[in-house]
Design a protein with these regions (language model features):
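Second-shell loop/turn segments in exported
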Residues: 58-64, 122-130, 204-214, 228-238, ...
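Solvent-exposed, polar/charged alpha-helical surfaces in well-ordered, non-transmembrane soluble domains
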Residues: 72, 76, 137, 141, ...
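Short, well-ordered surface patches within globular domains
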Residues: 211-270, 314-318
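Hydrophobic membrane-insertion alpha-helices, especially the h-region
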Residues: 6-21
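A cross-family detector of function-defining hotspots
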Residues: 25-111, 138-186, 191, 313-328
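Intrinsically disordered, low-complexity
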Residues: 170-237
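Positively charged n-region of N-terminal signal peptides that target proteins for export
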Residues: 1-4
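A well-ordered secondary-structure block
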Residues: 118-171, 268-330
Length: 330
C-alpha cells in the first residue's frame, strides 16, 4: 500500500502493499487463529497488568503518563523508548509501546520533563472522565468551548477544523481528535505545553533531512498503532517501498503538484513496477497541508478511502517518503 502524506511542511508518501504469495489455506487459517489468540491475550494483559488510573495532578493521562512528569518516572513505568525521532518543535518524540504496538504513546521532553504527549489508543484517562470513544458533544460539555485561534508572533492561526478541538488551560494545549466515521467520538489526544508550543515560531517546523526522516518513521508507527487499536496485524517497514514513495514526494514538492499520477502519467502501480516491486494489491494515500505526522495521520483516518487503505487487512508492507516544498510544506 502506498501512502503519500504531504504536509504543508513536507510531502509525505506512504506505500502499503500485499506482496505476491502462493495461496496456502492452512497457513492462512493458522494465522487467523494466532491473531484471534493474540487479540484476546492482549486484552487480558492490558486489563491485568496496565491498570489505568484517573490522573490526580493533570487533566489527562495516557497509560498513566502525565504532563510534567520526569523522564525517569516515565521510564520507570514504560521502560526505554522503542524509537526516538525529531519533531517540528525542535525537540524529540520518544515512542513507547509494549510488544507489538500495544499501549502506544509518544512523549516529548524539555529539561527531562514531559512537555508533550500523544496517543491514538484506548489508554486515555482524565479527571473529567473523557476517554477513547467519548462523544464530541460530551468533550465540549466537560472541557468548555474550544480555542478559535492560536497566535504566533503577529500572526493568528484559526482553529476551525471540525475533525478536532483545541483546548487551552493551565498552560497546556489539548487537541482532541474525533473519528467522523464513528459518530465523532474521541480517537486520539495530543497535549503540548505552552513552553513546547512557543518553540515553534511559525506554523511549520524548519525543514531538514532529519525531520523528513523522522516524519517517515513516525507515520509508520502511527499506522501500526492504529491497526493494533483496530485489532489488525501490524505492517513491516520496506526501504524499497519507501524509496519509491520518497521519489514521488520529491517530485511533487519540486514540481508543485499533488496527485497520485505523476507528470509522466505514471500511476502509483506503474511506479512500483518500474522500481521492481511485485505485489498482489497496493494502495496509496496522499495528504497535504498538515503541520506534523500526527495531524497528517489523523486527517487520513477521517478520509474514507485513505482510512480503508490504513485498515486494509490484506496489506503486509509499508513504505513512507517525505519531502518539503519551497514554502516549508511537507
Amino acid at each position: 500500500m502506498k501512502k503519500f502524506i504531504v504536509t504543508v511542511v513536507a510531502f509525505l508518501s506512504i506505500i502499503i502493499i500485499a506482496p505476491i504469495t502462493e495461496f496456502k489455506p492452512f497457513i492462512h487459517l493458522q494465522n487467523e487463529v494466532r491473531q484471534y489468540i493474540d487479540i484476546h491475550i492482549n486484552k487480558e494483559t492490558i486489563s491485568a497488568e496496565n491498570k489505568l488510573d484517573t490522573p490526580k495532578k493533570q487533566q489527562f493521562a495516557f497509560n498513566n503518563i502525565q504532563m510534567n512528569m520526569s523522564k525517569s518516572d516515565v521510564e520507570k513505568t514504560l521502560n526505554k523508548p522503542k524509537r526516538v525521532t525529531f519533531n517540528e518543535y525542535g525537540t524529540k518524540w520518544y515512542t513507547y509501546y509494549d510488544g507489538d504496538y500495544n499501549n502506544f504513546i509518544m512523549v516529548s521532553y524539555i529539561k527531562d520533563k514531559v512537555n508533550a504527549l500523544y496517543t491514538n489508543q484506548n489508554i486515555i484517562t482524565s479527571k473529567s472522565k473523557i476517554k477513547y470513544n467519548t462523544p464530541k458533544s460530551v468533550v465540549r460539555q466537560r472541557l468548555g468551548e474550544p480555542e478559535t485561534e492560536i497566535v504566533k508572533g503577529r500572526v493568528r492561526y484559526e482553529q476551525n477544523n471540525k475533525e478536532y478541538d483545541v483546548f487551552h488551560k493551565n498552560h497546556i494545549y489539548t487537541t482532541v481528535f474525533y473519528d467522523k466515521h464513528r459518530r465523532n467520538n474521541v480517537t486520539a489526544v495530543l497535549q503540548v505545553s505552552d513552553a513546547m508550543e512557543n518553540r515553534l515560531k511559525e506554523q511549520y517546523g524548519a525543514p531538514s533531512k532529519s525531520l523528513a526522516d523522522s516524519f517517515e518513521l513516525q507515520n509508520f508507527d502511527l499506522v501500526n498503532a492504529e491497526r493494533k487499536q483496530h485489532q489488525l496485524s501490524t505492517l513491516k517497514y520496506s526501504k524499497q517501498n519507501s524509496e519509491t514513495a520518497r521519489k514521488h514526494s520529491k517530485d511533487m514538492a519540486k514540481n508543485h503538484y499533488f496527485d497520485h499520477t505523476n507528470l509522466k502519467g505514471q500511476s502509483p502501480f506503474d511506479r512500483l513496477k518500474k522500481d521492481g516491486i511485485t505485489f498482489n494489491s497496493a494502495g496509496e494515500n496522499l495528504a497535504y497541508g498538515q503541520v506534523s505526522s500526527i495531524y497528517a495521520h489523523q486527517g487520513l483516518m477521517n478520509s474514507i478511502g485513505h482510512r480503508k487503505n490504513i485498515l486494509n487487512d490484506t496489506f503486509k508492507i509499508l513504505g513512507v517518503g517525505v519531502d518539503f516544498n519551497d514554502e516549508k510544506q511537507p
